[in-house]
């Protein structure tokens, strides 16, 4: 069953509207980004989503384990999505916290997989100027050689959501193509995506 994640939420009113939709995961960005949230914002947003039984994912880039663990505790995160490489030791510590770990692989011309990945799932995203939220896609045919479950991110919108589904991704991660302003998601665009996926 395909699941959806909307990433880069930072507005509480927006979050309350989104929480009513059939979306499984919501992403809060703790790394440097126009969509970055403070710990206080994260706590409030997380409470909104948990009230509707949604999963909350913290997005990190270079943050150390101590910072990540603090965010997990303070914002009651269900999982983390991280751009730097997670070590075996870090993965074991995170498992004790009862959170899932998504390792991001930034793709340009090849999948460029590390020999061993310590994560529950790999998230493939397009390599861009920013670490995520660039609104660009990579060549999804590259995923044909990957045999494990994965998450797909990068430039997914109404124009290519069916193509994204055909990659076999277990979770689609949507962000900038669903915005009117940085961090404000367009509810109507998301409803259109949900309608398309029912076809």
Curated annotation (Swiss-Prot):
Q: Which UniProt keywords are listed?
A: Amino-acid biosynthesis, Aromatic amino acid biosynthesis, Isomerase, Tryptophan biosynthesis
Q: In which pathway does it act?
A: Amino-acid biosynthesis; L-tryptophan biosynthesis; L-tryptophan from chorismate: step 3/5
Please give the coiled-coil regions recorded for this protein: none
- Give a GO molecular function annotation for the protein: phosphoribosylanthranilate isomerase activity
Family that this chain belongs to: Belongs to the TrpF family.
InterPro entries for this protein: Aldolase_TIM, PRAI_dom, RibuloseP-bd_barrel, TrpF_fam
List the HAMAP family hit by this protein, alphabetically.
Answer: PRAI (MF_00135)
What are the BP-aspect GO terms? L-tryptophan biosynthetic process
Q: Which reaction does it catalyse?
A: N-(5-phospho-beta-D-ribosyl)anthranilate = 1-(2-carboxyphenylamino)-1-deoxy-D-ribulose 5-phosphate
Q: Which CDD domains match?
A: PRAI
Per the UniProt entry, the Enzyme Commission number(s) are 5.3.1.24
Q: Which PANTHER family match?
A: N-(5'-PHOSPHORIBOSYL)ANTHRANILATE ISOMERASE
Alphabetized SUPFAM superfamilies for the sequence: Ribulose-phoshate binding barrel (SSF51366)
Top-level class of the enzyme under EC nomenclature? isomerase
User: In its keyword annotation, does this UniProt entry include Isomerase?
Assistant: yes
* Name of protein: N-(5'-phosphoribosyl)anthranilate isomerase
